Amino acid sequence: MKDVVTSPANLGKFQDPDVTADGQTRASVALSHPETLWFNTGTLCNIECANCYIFSSPSNDALVYITESEVRDYLSQITERGWPISEIGFTGGEPFMNPEIIGMTRAALEAGHEVLILTNAMRPMMRKSMRAGLLDLAQDWRDRITLRISVDHWSEALHDEERGKGAFALTIEGMQWLRDNGFAMTVAGRTVWGESEAQSRDGYRSLYAEHGFDIDADDPAATVLFPEMDETAEVPEITTACWDILGKSPSEPMCASSRMVVKRKGAEKPAVLACTLLPYSPEFELGETLAEAERDVKLNHPHCAKFCVLGGASCSG
């Protein structure tokens, strides 16, 4: 399984890790300030979205369930390497499909980290065992747990267009439970429908007001509007000269501040990846340990350019 199929518009690009198609030095990013370590809990999901970047579905187990013991090992490595990690993120798939998500979350909290869980807040989260687990964690660590809810669009019709009929209502039900039990929430939306950012934020603001959700529609970290990853679009390669031209710093892309741990189907051990967006590209797999994952990342993928450098996206909260 690949992350992207090279489109005709990008033929000849993103081939050599060191040099762009026109012979310039390709930009790279150092792990300058590790702040977030992500764990992919597995690619299994309770739904199959129309345009999921990681192809999560009820049948895709390309990334299998990571275990609590494996997570604890990486938490120990954080201490050993002296990484100043403030946040542990859990993503999927749907994290609440993984039967050990509560234990993994507890391990991260016990280690002193903030925890961010990306979820659709649907039936997996609303199972009795998961709700009980969240409430138990909240007794000691409520102020260090945030759930980022996938609300692709503020309207039911367009959200369900992406996620299936009835998905919006189930997500709102889950958010209402989180609201009623005092959990901090943020929202991840999308920009595929051609609205301006102001229009999108106005729509989310109305949604939050309707349901009494304490979420700031104007804060880009609280209502995250992700740019679309159009695999057919032509994108420029990022050279070392681009930083000054664009007025950006190599400390800004996600790979300057985060890594993601995954466990591939059939693999004996988990692996550490440079980026949450490229789970299937071998060149972005850095090794099995955090020590191996400290090396620089060459921006040799269309997503690096369009989504991270030009789109300015970040997965952290």
Give the predicted meaning of each segment.
Residues T36, T146, S257:
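Broad gene-expression machinery/nucleic-acid interaction feature
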Residues S59-D73, P95-W141, L147, V151-L170, ...:
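Canonical radical SAM enzyme core domain
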Residues P84-I88, V115, W141-V151, G166-V235:
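Conserved C-terminal portion of the radical SAM core fold
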Residues A209, P227-G317:
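Accessory C-terminal segments flanking Radical SAM cores
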